[in-house]
């Protein structure tokens, strides 16, 4: 099959494209290599993907409609996996316009490409942030998404609604995957597990927002890639949660990393940001039933794999700048 994967130089995009290439699929990778975080990570991922002869890369700005629609000149694309986005709750508060352009306009342009090119399947990467500070745990897909706590979450809700519109009017098979805190090797340096491992290894303080009792459903990246690939076979329209199936407090996460690295963390506590969700836990019943998907990694196993990647790439990781 031939897949268009946006955000191919990104964390999840890299792992998803790699998995597809290893199974002899053809990939059109799209990314604009922006400097949202250290581009050395993005370039290193692209270098790995470019070793595959079935990988073709385009440095394309998805907010530019004409550039996106020019992709219709490609030979028949079977499915689009749309991962390119501006991510991050706190960052979106300082520049909401960038999130509107890169998360909403870009999605609209891709949906239009699907329409005019008769691409049958479209998968949108969304986020558990759309649920706001929901108190119902585990959270299923029927929980209302009308009270987002950040422009990031609001932009993803808008992208979801546009995706439904194009399914409804043009019959595009559409899967929306709401990710719960993804982590793993080659991760994003603005995410907590990457930050904590790097800072603890370097004997630098880590910052914990709140008292350490807030919790997240952490999801290992190859589990996410498996869910994305399975979703491209969907007929119809569905929203799925993609989570690890259990919640881990920040305090416990630090202990897991300390045990792995055999080093103690230097901890600084600061007040919890009001845009942060206090607890998250995915109900993954729906995706298990419809796509026959289950996570393979628990938090201890996933952190161990992530830590191994760090220890195997210390020189490279030491050069990576962390993003606040």
Predicted regions and their residues:
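Short alpha-helical
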Residues: 63-66, 87, 187, 248-249, ...
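Residue-level recognition of oxygen-bearing side chains
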Residues: 67, 98, 105, 144, ...
